[in-house]
């Protein structure tokens, strides 16, 4: 959803897991892509005393578009679990580590990519703002769920389709001819929503929004 959990929310989550003796697997893959004015808090900073029951997953793939390098990090403090994980990776998965090229790309991204990343954040913020203004101007019953992190925008179109996901899916794919993530695939609460990747050139975002608007107008929804 693009929500960045606050320190208090993380603390409450850790307390619940402590109470019921549960592990925490925390996917922080989008942690570098945070909106201006929003603070990301690593879960390890909140509960270092619970580190033996926490697994943190990160990767440069989302932020730096390096998914093809197949390089990621899994931080496991618990020595027993660490050994089990290594045995599983080396045995069952037949993987013995990242490739030399992947490691080099990851190091370069994290050590030399700050200026590029700051420019990317500005560009993403601009794309979010463009979609927000477009909806207000042309599709006023829809609204953008403002993401605190990630490059994924949620469009709430229930003002036009009233949670009818099949109608919305047909509008998007057959009328507008755009392939977004249908909200309902993420659960019942996602009905009537579409998820759009805004890490795209502005021209692509403009074309997408224009197609959606045209489809809604042709169906006499606007």
Which residues are covered by each model-predicted region?
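PLP-dependent class I/II
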Residues: 1-222
């Amino acid at each position: 959803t693009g929500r960045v959990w606050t320190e208090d929310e993380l603390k409450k989550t850790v307390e619940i897991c402590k109470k019921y003796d549960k592990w925490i697997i925390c996917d922080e893959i989008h942690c570098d892509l945070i909106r201006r004015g929003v603070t990301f808090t690593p879960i390890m900073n909140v509960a270092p005393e619970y580190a033996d029951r926490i697994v943190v997953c990160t990767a440069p793939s989302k932020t730096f578009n390096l998914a093809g390098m197949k390089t990621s990090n899994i931080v496991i403090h618990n020595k027993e679990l660490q050994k089990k994980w290594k045995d599983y990776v080396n045995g069952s998965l037949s993987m013995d580590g990242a490739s030399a090229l992947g490691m080099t790309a990851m190091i370069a991204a994290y050590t030399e990519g700050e200026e590029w990343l700051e420019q990317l954040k500005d560009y993403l913020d601009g794309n979010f703002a463009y979609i927000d203004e477009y909806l207000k101007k042309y599709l006023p019953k829809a609204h953008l769920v403002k993401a605190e992190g990630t490059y994924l925008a949620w469009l709430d179109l229930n003002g036009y389709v009233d949670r009818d996901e099949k109608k919305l899916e047909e509008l998007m794919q057959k009328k507008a001819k755009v392939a977004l993530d249908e909200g309902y695939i993420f659960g019942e609460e996602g009905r009537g929503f579409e998820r759009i990747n805004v890490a795209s050139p502005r021209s692509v975002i403009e074309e997408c929004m224009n197609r959606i608007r045209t489809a809604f107008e042709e169906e006499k929804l606007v």
